[in-house]
């Protein structure tokens, strides 16, 4: 069974995190640091009781993209989403979704398809992040999230403040767990001990293009099937590969076909 980086019950008791984290004086992604700028598009998914469990990215004023495994088995109204704040506990806007769309290729045991969209009943004010267009090996990327900051399950608490880790895309062969290289990205673990961890699932992997952030990936799972975070590169669903599907869901529905008016009988 695919081991995702969503916060499990053991994580929730300690409060959860995002990608494979590392230790330091302050809570952070494994090996990460507190975000050095606002990332209003980063979304924090939490239960209605306030328990954080996954991240996401605002890609449209009414839509957040996250990992399919984050929302599997959940009703849209069973959780809330905070956007527009680097602090997952306050600020920005807190919204209860009204609809979920999971990619039809998703299974909890296979590769690919680990992507879903969360719809809001009304647009939010936070600025969305555009989708990127290229995912070449060697591309510098930034991982963002509130995931666990120590590498073993349930070992620590989730930071309130958004964390970041700068790394790069690497060849798919660096991820030894099953990976679908046509729709998934293998991302390096700097120094062999930094990366995504529990609670980082669904969160953004972004890159800068002409001084602006674009979304390349969605945090999915470890690249080596280990329960200890950041011991190997991690696997991210490619938002670029799924851009067509994302845009199709974001498009407004076509207007209803008008019912022809019957011709009156003379």
PLM feature spans:
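Protease-domain processing segments flanking chymotrypsin-fold serine proteases, especially trypsin-like
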Residues: 1-65, 73-74, 78-85, 159-160, ...
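C-terminal subregion of chymotrypsin/trypsin-like serine protease catalytic domains
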Residues: 3, 58-71, 80, 164, ...
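Active-site region of chymotrypsin-like
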Residues: 37-52, 123-128, 163-203, 209-233
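Active-site-proximal beta-strand/loop segments in catalytic clefts of secreted hydrolases
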Residues: 45-48, 58-61, 67-70, 83-86, ...
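Short, solvent-exposed loop/turn segments that connect beta-strands within catalytic domains
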Residues: 50, 88-91, 108-110, 154-155, ...
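Disulfide-rich extracellular modules and peptides
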Residues: 72, 152, 157, 177, ...
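Subtilisin-like serine protease catalytic core
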Residues: 76, 136-138, 156-157, 208-217
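Chymotrypsin/trypsin-fold serine protease catalytic domain
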Residues: 87, 94-95, 100, 112-192, ...
């Amino acid at each position: 069974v695919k081991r995702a980086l969503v916060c499990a019950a053991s994580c929730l008791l300690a409060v959860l995190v995002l990608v494979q984290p590392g230790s330091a004086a302050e809570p952070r992604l494994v090996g990460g640091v507190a975000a050095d700028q606002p990332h209003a598009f980063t979304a924090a998914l939490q239960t209605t009781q306030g328990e954080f469990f996954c991240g996401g990215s605002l890609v449209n004023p009414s839509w957040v993209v996250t990992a399919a495994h984050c929302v599997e088995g959940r009703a849209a109204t069973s959780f809330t989403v905070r956007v527009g704040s680097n602090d997952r506990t306050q600020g920005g806007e807190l919204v209860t979704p009204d609809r979920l769309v999971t990619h039809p290729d998703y299974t909890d045991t296979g590769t690919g398809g680990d992507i879903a969209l969360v719809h809001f009943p009304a647009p939010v004010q936070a600025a969305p992040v555009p989708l990127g267009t290229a995912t070449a090996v060697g591309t510098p990327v930034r991982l963002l999230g509130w995931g666990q900051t120590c590498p073993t399950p349930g070992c620590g608490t989730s930071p309130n403040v958004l964390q970041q880790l700068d790394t790069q895309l690497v060849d798919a062969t660096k991820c030894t767990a099953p990976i679908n290289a046509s729709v998934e990205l293998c991302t390096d673990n700097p120094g062999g001990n930094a990366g995504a961890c529990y609670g980082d699932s669904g969160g953004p992997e972004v890159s800068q293009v002409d001084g602006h952030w674009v979304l390349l990936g969605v945090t999915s799972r470890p690249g080596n099937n280990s329960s200890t975070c950041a011991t190997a590169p991690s696997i991210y669903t490619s938002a670029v590969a799924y851009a067509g599907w994302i845009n199709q869901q974001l498009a407004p529905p076509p207007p209803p076909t008008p019912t022809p008016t019957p011709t009156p009988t003379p």
